[in-house]
Amino acid sequence: MLERIAITVPIFPVKRNNPLLSEHMKIWLWNTSPWLWAALGGILIGLNAPGWHTQLVGLVAHLPVMLMLEQVRKCHGSFGKRLLLAILLCWGVGGVGAMMSAHWITNSAHVFGHLPWVVSMGITGMGYGLEVGLLLFVLHAMPILLLRSGRVWDLPVRLCWFLWVDTWYPRLIHWNFGGLTFTQVPLLEQVADLIGASGMALFSIGLSLWLLLLWRRAVEGQDISRRVLGVGLACYFGLLGSGIGYGAWQQSDVVGHSSGTPLHIVSVQPNFSLRKLASNPDLAYSERIRNFKTLLADSYHALSQPPESSGVPRLLVWPESVFPAAFFKNPETRQAVSRFAREHQTAILLASVDWSGTPGNYRFQGISVLVGPDGQVRGRYNKIFLIPFGETIPLSDWFPGLAQLLRENIHNLSEFEAGREFTAFSLSEQLRLSAPICFDIFAPDTIRNMTRNGSQLAVNLSNLAWFGQSTASDNMEAVLRWRAIENRTPVLFASNNGRSVLIGADGQSLSPRLGLFEEGVISTTIKLTPRFSFYREYQEWVNITWLVLFLGLLWIGHRQENLLNGW
């Protein structure tokens, strides 16, 4: 069916005195296979991911996807055929991008799923690539297939559609293209406290759409004046300059603000590789206790250097999966923690597991626990965001047969109960903090609601050792920087294997970044103070603004260029 879809050869009705491209070059570009554009788009989107240090390719990464879909729109055939082709092409883009960017998923399937490397990569490309491909289809293909191609007005409509959809579109792991592109551009990423990390796609998708406008003039021969191109470019650089200016002002305000309640943070990165543990749940309890004794010894050594100012409260942080037992079910280890806290006059923040119910009907929870310097438990938080196919089986209630098949064939597949409370712990009357666990931070509302509940510091307790030597830590750090800026709150990334780091309210590092699979300690004093964030308080209104702009520009575009084409 798809083999009979043909691309029309162009007719260039507009003749200019100074053409941008030769007729031969125009025809060659026009007839470039959409699958070639799909491959190029997938490569660029893969390079846009953390870990490659090429994230700025995101400025143009979506242009090949747009050109690919322009080819689809010009295909002969029914709407259904073009729809199917667009879905397959977007899946192809997502598959290539996923295989390049999600090595951490491939590594997990290979190591813990006991699958050959080629099969693991195929699962990443087909499975995770499908999620990325569907996202690209909704963001890019839907407006192209449903709107009549205009000369100008369909482009701002598509931009606002992208910005609106990206705020709410469901994902197993919530990430966004705008944040990925500008995650290490300090001046520009400060606008995330106005429009969110996803809103930064305004600058990357906006540039790609302007380049598409240039394509329409240079290759398709549309009668688009240089004045229109100039106005579009001026608008882009005006927004870019405003964003950079706002970022410079915000950074100077955050850096220059020295007041607040001091807290001395000691975060231990013990380098507990969990490969053996994760692939062997029956690992001897004695070895887990040995690890715990090593952790206590490392903590004692780290606490031997007191804060510069006396009387400053201390917080000792242990990452996820380094505590050897269920905290509330094992009195011996719980008492050891309380005793250590009292002896060293330090609060301790740790992650553990808990369960309730009857034998055969247990409900498990991942939890974080704060123990005060008096040895008393100050509170617990139940993990909200569960890792798909690691801590939960998505849609298991809808497909019970498939869920049971996965339980029988995937080693170490756990099923946890999600928490519902965005807990903020009280360390003192002046100090409140939160402790989201691992992938909790991929859901934007988690840290947002914790901060709105009074948290002045978010401590992310993570277990990433099972991802091995991959880019998992780079992905986590990028997302945590978005959350710090979006909510204007410091964030501590405490990982059991690296790369632990303390991130300030402006998204910049306040401590050295510890190495991957290296032992180390972060020991620093930070002053905590509540800060205002427009996006944190009015996120819903930002989303509504994108929708209103989309509808308004759609109405204008329809009046100017009949964009709805009979709809």
Model-predicted regions and their roles:
Residues 49-66, 97-104, 269-270, 311-326, ...:
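Short, conserved active-site loops that position catalytic residues or coordinate cofactors/metal ions
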Residues 120-125, 273-283, 406-407:
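Short glycine/proline- and acidic residue-enriched helix-loop micro-motifs
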Residues 20-253, 468-469, 483, 495-506, ...:
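Membrane-embedded alpha-helical bundles of multi-pass enzymes
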Residues 247-389, 424-431, 435, 439, ...:
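Soluble catalytic regions of membrane-associated enzymes that act on cell-envelope
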Residues 159, 315, 322-323, 329-350, ...:
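CN hydrolase (nitrilase-like) catalytic-core segments centered on the catalytic cysteine
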Residues 2-7:
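Extreme N-terminal basic, low-complexity initiation segments
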